[in-house]
Amino acid sequence: MPRGMGWGRGRGRRRKMRMIGFIPQVRHFYPAQPPVFQPKPPIFMTYEEFEALRLVDYEGLTQEEAGQRMGVSRGTVWRALTSARKKVAQMLVEGRELIILPGGNEVPRGADE
């Protein structure tokens, strides 16, 4: 088969769809007073990271329970949660903007029913 045709087109496995129970109404956070020094670029957080943070830190679920709700493994929740916590800490410590954006593979819970 010619190159670029057939089986070998994709790289790795397809990303599993993540079930999102809450789409944030406020998606852009910024400091009340912009820094006087050179501003740093904004931080981008995906819906997946936001959902993991919401379920574990806000609702108090375990990572296993959050993974079941999102339709992913506990390890995936751990990765998203670690990334989200780091981004929130960067936003607070460095006074940077935080923008929450869809990652492309999230589905609102109940949309497939």
Swiss-Prot record:
InterPro entries, per database record: RNA_pol_sigma_r3/r4-like, UPF0251, WH-like_DNA-bd_sf
Classification via Gene3D superfamilies: Winged helix-like DNA-binding domain superfamily/Winged helix DNA-binding domain
Pfam families: DUF134
Organism domain of life: Archaea
Protein family (similarity comment): Belongs to the UPF0251 family.
Protein known as: UPF0251 protein TK0562
Species whose genome carries this gene: Thermococcus kodakarensis (strain ATCC BAA-918 / JCM 12380 / KOD1) (Pyrococcus kodakaraensis (strain KOD1))
